[in-house]
Curated annotation (Swiss-Prot):
Source organism of this protein record: Vibrio atlanticus (strain LGP32)
Function, as annotated: The alpha subunit is responsible for the aldol cleavage of indoleglycerol phosphate to indole and glyceraldehyde 3-phosphate.
The protein's name in its UniProt record: Tryptophan synthase alpha chain
Family per similarity comment: Belongs to the TrpA family.
HAMAP family: Trp_synth_alpha
Length: 268
């Protein structure tokens, strides 16, 4: 059984959903980034969703763009990221680890080579934000060849045809958009997602994690009540990093204090 499946099985036995924080690897620097990822897991994160720094993140709001800039200023490259992720994998063998990134970085060294490096680092899934299902053929083929789940976004406006493709091509989990637009905690998540979840279930999609604009425990609770398998929080986590760049210890404490109630909110 793969790591996502066994996670969702374990959580179901405890009547819990998943809480999954997102951070950019290498933000604000490699050494602190490793401590950040460890802190998130120790504070209760069920899985990690990670970004690889990129100079032009199209789907991201200003908070995550700032994380990219800090990491790039600290000379973080994909090689540095894979090394850090490998260290997290060694420390937490059961933890599902996903990447959320852009096609340019996948193309940079060849698609197969990229997924092979993911597999070696112990990564479970890859979501490429700017590749829709109808353009995903070569990415899905390479992902499957190396045992990596391709993850797809189910937007609130999706047609049945799109949701069927997301369900058939995707594995691990489905990234459920709570609203259209760029990422960010500034604009609160728009529920209701129940109708979208019902449609996904019709196509037997992988379990849905609700993302975009999730910044408070009550939003996590709402996602679980609506039927999502869990929630992903990115900008709210990265904002804590941004606000504490000069105080590394205070940053880790604030991150732990954010994650613990978010995880507690997944209890049904």
């Amino acid at each position: 059984m793969d790591r996502y499946q066994s996670l969702f099985t374990r959580l179901a036995e405890k009547n819990q959903g998943a809480f999954v924080p997102f951070v950019t690897v290498g933000d604000p620097n490699p050494e602190q980034s490793l401590k950040i990822m460890e802190t998130l897991v120790e504070a209760g994160a069920d899985a990690l969703e990670l970004g690889i720094p990129f100079s032009d993140p199209l789907a991201d709001g200003p908070t995550i763009q700032g994380a990219n800039i800090r990491a790039l200023d600290s000379k973080v490259t994909p090689d540095v990221c894979f090394d850090l992720i490998g260290q997290i994998r060694a420390k937490y063998p059961e933890l599902p680890i996903g990447l959320l990134m852009y096609a340019n970085l996948v193309y940079a060294r060849g698609i197969e080579n990229f997924y092979e490096r993911c597999a070696k680092a112990g990564i479970d899934s890859v979501l490429i934000a700017d590749v829709p299902t109808n353009e995903s053929g070569e990415f899905v083929a390479a992902a499957k060849k190396f045992g990596i789940h391709p993850i797809f976004i189910a937007p609130p406006t999706a047609s049945d045809e799109t949701l069927q493709s997301v369900s058939e091509l995707g594995g691990g989990y489905t990234y459920l958009l709570s609203r259209a637009g760029v990422t960010g905690a500034e604009t609160k998540a728009n529920m209701p997602v129940t109708a979208l979840l019902d449609r996904l279930n019709k196509f037997d999609a992988p379990p849905a994690l609700l993302g975009f604009g999730i910044s408070a425990p009550e939003q996590v609770k709402e996602a679980i009540v609506a039927g999502a398998a869990g929630a992903i929080s990115g900008s709210a986590v990265v904002k804590i990093i941004e606000n504490n760049v000069e105080q590394p210890e205070a940053m880790l404490k604030a991150l732990a204090e954010f994650v613990t109630p978010m995880k507690a909110a997944t209890q049904k």
